[in-house]
Amino acid sequence: MSDLYAVIGNPVAHSKSPLIHAGFARQSGQDVRYEAILAPLDGFVETVAAFRQRGGKGANVTVPFKLEAHTLSSCLTERAKAAGAVNTLVFGADDILGDNTDGAGLVRDVAVNLGYALDDRRVLLMGAGGAARGVIRPLLEHEPAALVIANRTPQKADDLQRLFASSGNVLSAAYEDLRGQEFDLVINATSASLQGDLPPLPKGIFAGASLAYDMMYGKGLTSFLQFAQQQGAARLADGIGMLVEQAAESFFLWRGIRPETEPVIGMLRSSLGSP
């Protein structure tokens, strides 16, 4: 009988996680079944309990339940504590381990798949919500020269700066404060691209050999990546690699096997018609 896993969210029909984990299972010969579960907005805990009763071994958690998953977990990894949110649950006999693989997924995509070294780089992280918070500690572990957090509401960026100040050279800024500065890596951790919108970035922020990275993805270039291309960013990357890499980290937690991500990234790009 196949071991059962799932992604739990609301909405969840759009999730690529079942496709990704099916690819991992085929390649590694693991007998697993992975499904998408729509949880009521007020029924996440009950949905997890019902899934465990059905024999679920673990679950991915997507919006809007990552904070609830953090609260539900009986023990947390250090990176989940730093992120303040959980996207991966591992079910034990009497406990639930909560982890956050988003930051590891981003860093692995940038450093390994894209071959872009993070040490001594000036990094700009746009956004101060859960997506941004989840990647700060993993980015700082690679010792960038500076990590600047910019947000439309500067107070939120200030809060994150204080939270991670002891982990590296972290600064906070309003977007207008960025005028005249250049960055080697610019990461969009906002959801603006989903609406075809763009954070209010000043022109001239991309350094000569810069990488523009959008956590969002779609069939073509996102609005942020279009802006970056027009502004002379040397390289562009969307969030498909991060999506697959964070899933691979979850798969490793559950199965003890680290899958090959390159063929799954290629398969996902083909299915989306993404460049």
UniProtKB/Swiss-Prot annotation:
Shikimate binds at S15, K16, S17, T62, N87, D102, Y217. The active site is at K66. CDD domains: NAD_bind_Shikimate_DH. Keywords: Amino-acid biosynthesis, Aromatic amino acid biosynthesis, NADP, Oxidoreductase. InterPro entries: Aminoacid_DH-like_N_sf, NAD(P)-bd_dom_sf, SDH_C, Shikimate_DH, Shikimate_DH-bd_N, Shikimate_DH_fam, Shikm_DH/Glu-tRNA_Rdtase. The keyword Ion transport does not apply. The keyword Cell division does not apply. Pathway: Metabolic intermediate biosynthesis; chorismate biosynthesis; chorismate from D-erythrose 4-phosphate and phosphoenolpyruvate: step 4/7. It catalyses: shikimate + NADP(+) = 3-dehydroshikimate + NADPH + H(+). GO terms for molecular function: NADP binding; shikimate 3-dehydrogenase (NADP+) activity. NADP(+) binds at E78, G127, A128, G129, G130, A131, N151, R152, T153, P154, Q155, K156, M215, G239. GO terms for cellular component: cytosol. It comes from the Bacteria. Its EC number is 1.1.1.25. GO terms for biological process: amino acid biosynthetic process; aromatic amino acid family biosynthetic process; chorismate biosynthetic process; shikimate metabolic process. Homodimer. HAMAP family: Shikimate_DH_AroE. Belongs to the shikimate dehydrogenase family. Involved in the biosynthesis of the chorismate, which leads to the biosynthesis of aromatic amino acids. Catalyzes the reversible NADPH linked reduction of 3-dehydroshikimate (DHSA) to yield shikimate (SA). This is Shikimate dehydrogenase (NADP(+)). It comes from Nitrosospira multiformis (strain ATCC 25196 / NCIMB 11849 / C 71). The gene is aroE.
